[in-house]
Structures are given as structure tokens and as C-alpha cells.
Amino acid sequence: MLEEECPVFGKKLLEWYLNNSPLLDRKWRHDRDPFRIVITEILLIRTRREAVERIYDEFFFRFKSPDDILNATEEELRKAIYTLGMRKRTELLRKAAEYLKLHGIRSPSDIEELPGAGEYVKNILKLRLFNAGSVAVDRNGARVLFRYFYGYVPEVEKPEKRKEIAEIKEKCLDLYEDKLTLSYALMDLGYYVCKPRKPECGRCPLKDTCKYAKDTP
């Protein structure tokens, strides 16, 4: 079933993303500096991307290296990111900076040891830094996948960890060559269109073949 549905899903999703990418784009997606890439993904954990965008330039003007983060006072670091929320974010930033300083990231396996990095962060970092690994599925992407292929979203804390997502990745998503673009397309569709409440099915490129859209008045 997945194998039959996958080509249509991927084609429509990627077409939508490529047609809309100028409007969806974020400046950090063009970064090539490993330090900035890793730290940005820490900043993005459990917060809205617009909040990160508002502090992005000022943050990296102040913190240009792991040492800049490690040498900053707790007050300086908190002040720089307080609008993002999450109490432990300063701790995660320091641990990531320390890891980058002491070990660096020279291969995908190094990312596995990065403190504070969950499955999604590890996957997106492997793709961005090495073009390696699996498609990165965050909560937004997981919501798209569940609604499209199963017609519902499970009421669990981390749907991206469900076995159904692993099956979709294995039999569908990871067959695509450009996994980074597919990752961005998934998360953007979930963020802007396939929202947690009141998804905008009418303007979704997948609506004609989506199980959730078909069953929703």
C-alpha cells in the first residue's frame, strides 16, 4: 500500500515546496558553517521558527564560535535567547558548544554523541552537514504523514517516534535521493498548512489523495 501511494505523495509534496520555497525559506537553511548549523538546530527546539528568526542575526553577531558561548555569563546567554522559552536551552547550548570545541563533527557518527540532540535533530544535522542518513521528520512532518497515510494523528507526546513513521520512512521517504529537500517540504507543509488544529485542507497540495482530507467535511 505504501509503495503504491508514495510516488504521488512525494511528487505533489516536492512540487508544492519547490513552487513555494521562496516564501517558505529561512536564512539558516543556507548556512554552511557547522557551528552555526548545530547551534541553530538547538535554538529551534520547541519554539516557533519566527522567534528564532527575530534573534538570529544578533545572536550570531554576538556568538561566533563555541568559545563565545562557553565564555558568556549565564545572564548574557539567557538574555540572548529568553524569547525562545525552554529553561534548559542555555544548558543545551553550552553542552553543544563544549562538544564542538572538544570533539568537533567530522562524520555522521559524531552527531550521535551530540548532547541534547533528539532523533529529528540528529537526522537533520546529518543531512545538512554530510548529506547522509534518513529523512528528518519533526512533529509537523509526522502530522502530515499520519493524516495522509492513516487519516488521523495519534494522541501521543512524540508521534515522530511511532513505528508507523519508521515504516513510512523505510518504504517511501528514504527512497528519495534529495532527503534534505523532502525533510524541509514535510515540515513546512505541516507548519503552514497541515496545522495541529484547523488544518487548511482546501489549500493543501495533497488533499485529493489524503485520507484525512477525504474523511473531513
What are these language model-derived features?
Residues 61-71, 115-121, 148-155, 162-175, ...:
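Short, mixed-charge aromatic SLiMs
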